[in-house]
């Protein structure tokens, strides 16, 4: 899913503009749209870029998804690793009121921002990582999905069906371990699609390959069609392929 996140960002992204207040005191290249609103002409989901769903401290963690054991170990390490900027803040303000739980990169495990998270329902006294280590993955959170502003509940049936197809595609598709060098390419791809995914010359980078975004999307959507057809047959519908 991490490799395919640009596909989700492009098709479901719904935040090409942001409130001007979010940019106060920050360097940016966003353009004025209307009063109080900034945007980029070819943006898809600025929420998923460096001005939104990001945490610079957490990017240094290098939490890996290649296997569950390493993921759990990396997550637990982050909860006990001090982060100097947080340490400088201290735990209490001048009046003795608490301002943070601790000075660690993650104050609690649920603070970890990521595009996808494996989850297990914790039992009494368990942390999320302990639940994963003890009983494995029960479900997966897909967190790269913008709220649909045209839906009363933030998502429509078509989008839910598409996410079901891509989740099944990711489950069945062979996926090699993700090295740091490729993670850098994935970060570049995500930035490209977030900021200029609707540009005609938007590109996707892979190890030893480069694609126009449109061509890359078509490759994967075409590969998903048999799964969509199978789901259509199973549930007597056509929503998965439409």
Predicted regions and their residues:
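Short, hydrophobic/amphipathic alpha-helical patches that form generic packing surfaces
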Residues: 3-6, 164-172, 222-226
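C-terminal, active-site-flanking charged/polar segments
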Residues: 144-150, 157-177
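Loop-rich catalytic cores of soluble enzymes, especially ATP-dependent carboxylate-amine ligases
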Residues: 1-131, 179-184, 202-209
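Structured core elements
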Residues: 112, 139-143
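Cationic, histidine-enriched alpha-helical/coil surfaces that engage anionic ligands
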Residues: 91, 188-242
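Core structural elements
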Residues: 134-138
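Glycine- and acidic
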Residues: 143-155, 202-210
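Flexible helix-coil linker/hinge segments at domain or subdomain boundaries
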Residues: 7-10, 167-196
């Amino acid at each position: 899913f991490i490799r395919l996140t640009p596909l989700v960002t492009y098709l479901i992204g719904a935040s090409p503009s942001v409130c001007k207040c979010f940019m106060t005191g920050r360097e940016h290249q966003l353009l004025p749209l209307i009063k109080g609103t900034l945007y980029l002409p070819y943006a898809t989901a600025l929420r998923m870029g460096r001005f939104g769903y990001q945490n610079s401290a957490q990017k240094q963690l290098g939490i890996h998804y290649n296997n569950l054991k390493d993921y759990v170990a990396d997550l637990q390490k982050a909860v006990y690793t001090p982060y100097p900027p947080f340490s400088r803040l201290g735990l209490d303000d001048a009046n003795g009121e608490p301002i943070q739980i601790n000075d660690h990169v993650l104050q609690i495990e649920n603070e970890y921002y990521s595009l996808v998270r494996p989850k297990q329902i914790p039992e009494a006294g368990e942390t999320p990582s302990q639940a994963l280590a003890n009983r494995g993955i029960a479900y997966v959170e897909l967190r790269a999905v913008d709220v649909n502003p045209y839906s009363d509940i933030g998502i429509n049936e078509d989008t839910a069906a598409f996410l079901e197809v891509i989740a099944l595609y990711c489950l069945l598709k062979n996926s090699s371990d993700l090295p740091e060098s490729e993670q850098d390419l994935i970060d570049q791809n995500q930035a490209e699609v977030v900021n200029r995914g609707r540009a005609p010359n938007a590109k996707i980078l892979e190890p030893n390959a480069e694609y126009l975004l449109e061509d890359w999307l078509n490759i994967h959507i075409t590969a998903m069609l048999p799964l969509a057809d199978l789901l259509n047959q199973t549930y007597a519908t056509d929503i998965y392929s439409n």
